Regions:
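Bacterial N-terminal signal peptides
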Residues: 17-29
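Sec/Tat signal peptide C-region and signal peptidase I cleavage site
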Residues: 30-35
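Long, low-hydrophobicity ectodomains and other hydrophilic envelope-associated domains
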Residues: 36-206
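N-terminal secretory signal peptides that target proteins for export/translocation
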Residues: 1-14
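Intrinsically disordered, low-complexity, compositionally biased regions/tails
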Residues: 11, 21-22, 156
Length: 206
């Protein structure tokens, strides 16, 4: 096993003015659904337009057991304030699983935090979790181990299903830049999620 392949990556930076993790962690306007109100929900999507997977069909499956509560959001906010990205990762590691994400070619891993946000046309489902590191990354302690978050957003449009979409950040870290703003650093392009299939009308009372 060589180290070269594991070390080949480029850092991409995204200012966090209105992007999903800021909204995910800072907004308190969400819909609360108890476990008694809903059953397990499944959303399927196809990832497109990525630098590493361009030309391939990459399927993404998000399974939702329950939605995170306001208390969970506060825990993550405090953890990031105290320990920044590593504090956030450690807090996510200690949380119970509220869902699961599986990508083509992987066995999938647990989601630690899922938020439901109502929109005029439907709802957005936002999630973040600590990323499962590959053996080569951990063994060689490559630079990619710093990108230890996976986050995403699925925007469900009930009025026009063709307008449903989303984004997935497979490997990222949350930092504070020189201007004091939250910034998302990625070691590969964000994945655009299309062909959204909302099997159970996720986030609605049935």
């Amino acid at each position: 096993m060589t180290r070269n392949n594991a070390d080949k990556f480029s850092i991409r930076k995204f200012s966090f003015g209105g992007l999903l993790l800021t909204a995910l962690l800072l907004t308190a306007v969400t819909v609360a659904l108890s476990a008694d109100d809903r059953k397990v929900e499944t959303i399927d999507a196809t990832a497109m337009g990525t630098s590493t997977q361009l030309g391939k069909v990459v399927s993404v499956k998000v399974t939702i057991y329950e939605y995170s509560e306001e208390e969970d959001r506060q825990i993550l906010m405090e953890a990031f304030t105290k320990g920044q990205n590593e504090g956030l990762v450690n807090a996510l590691t200690k949380m119970k699983s509220v869902g699961r994400i599986a990508i083509t070619g992987t066995i999938g891993y647990d989601l630690s935090f899922i938020r439901l946000v109502p929109t005029p046309t439907g709802r957005k489902i936002r999630f973040v979790t600590n990323r499962l590191l590959r053996f080569g990354e951990a063994y060689y302690n490559t630079q990619t181990t710093a990108f230890n978050l996976t986050a995403g957003e699925i925007d469900i449009n009930d009025s026009d299903k063709d307008k449903s979409g989303g984004v997935l950040y497979p490997a990222a870290q949350l930092v504070i830049n020189k201007e004091g703003q939250l910034e998302f650093q990625l070691n590969q392009n964000a994945w655009k999620l299309v062909n959204i299939i909302d099997w159970n009308k996720a986030g609605t009372l049935k």
